[in-house]
């Protein structure tokens, strides 16, 4: 009895010409993903500044000198977190760095698919992606709701998409 009689034996390999023809599209996608990572870094830095100003306003009535000094430090860029990209073999790693050069990983972004992962450790992401930066609705939500501490990366965060 032939169990494979219903299987269509089409060739599943890609020809070299097809591979070359789609290479430009793959490169464009990877460049877009890197651009979105840079935009995420910028949004995270802006959120840190906004949150620092909000925390400085908390001291307005109790210690106005501290508040004024803190606002000067924020404008001068002191005691700020800087977000940058470290690219590996498979992922872009969004890294948060302090002035004292201590680093921590904020998230990982898959270079080929654009999937955004919460960091499981300094070297590895969690298995399940939280968002996809190539999907417009998810990307816009991430840029509007990202926070420097990473609360938006938890599964029970506000996203309902």
Say what each PLM segment does.
Residues 1-2:
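Acidic, gly/ser/pro-rich intrinsically disordered tails
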């Amino acid at each position: 009895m032939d169990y494979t009689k219903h299987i269509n034996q089409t060739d599943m390999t890609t020809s070299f010409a097809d591979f070359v023809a789609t290479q430009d599209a793959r490169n464009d996608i990877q460049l877009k993903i890197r651009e979105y990572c840079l935009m995420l870094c910028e949004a995270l830095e802006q959120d840190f500044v906004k949150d620092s100003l909000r925390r400085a306003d908390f001291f307005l009535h109790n210690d106005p000198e501290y508040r004024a000094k803190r606002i000067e430090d924020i404008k001068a860029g002191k005691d700020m977190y800087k977000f940058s990209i470290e690219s590996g073999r498979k992922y872009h790693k969004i890294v948060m760095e302090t002035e004292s050069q201590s680093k921590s990983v904020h998230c990982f972004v898959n270079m080929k698919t654009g999937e955004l992962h919460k960091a499981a450790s300094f070297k590895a992401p969690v298995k399940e992606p939280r968002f996809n930066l190539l999907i417009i609705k998810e990307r816009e939500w991430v840029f509007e709701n990202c926070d420097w501490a990473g609360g938006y990366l938890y599964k029970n965060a506000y996203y309902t998409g």
